[in-house]
Amino acid sequence: PHDYLYRGMGFGYEGEGIGDSVVLRGKMMFMEEDQRTRSLSEGEKWNYLKDDDEIQAGLWRNLGASVSRGYNTYPMDVCGPSFFADETIQNVLARRSNVHEESARWPHEDVPCAVMVIDDTSVLEEDLTVQYQYLAVIHQRLHGLSRCGVPFRVHLFEDLERDDFPDC
């Protein structure tokens, strides 16, 4: 799913996994776009999109990030009627659907980008008392890379050995 804590305005569209490694292996990164909006009954929890302008910007941001990184995204909400019953949101999703379908025919190529490389075995070598993995990996990816304004990718350490690793 879309990372729960960082899905509001000012953040990127990041899943809770290493999607770029999934795509590199020729697999589909299927990302649940659990985007909370003003239509929820949860109040101000979960960093939601608050009005029509934020809804437009946030939902298009999510599709743009997904398409540009080779992910497939699908809108999903589990909290009441939410955006399934909101006309503004449904209109945005209908327009996005056309763009999403068309994007499969667009030329795609790698572009120069920043790369975060994660050693997924490193957690075995630490004592976990200072939450280093959260600070060094999750926090930096969500608070740093997704907000820095440049293209980036997140890969596993073992990806560097692959012949098809992109020239980032």
Model feature map: region roles:
Residues 1-168:
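Carbohydrate-binding surfaces of carbohydrate-active enzymes
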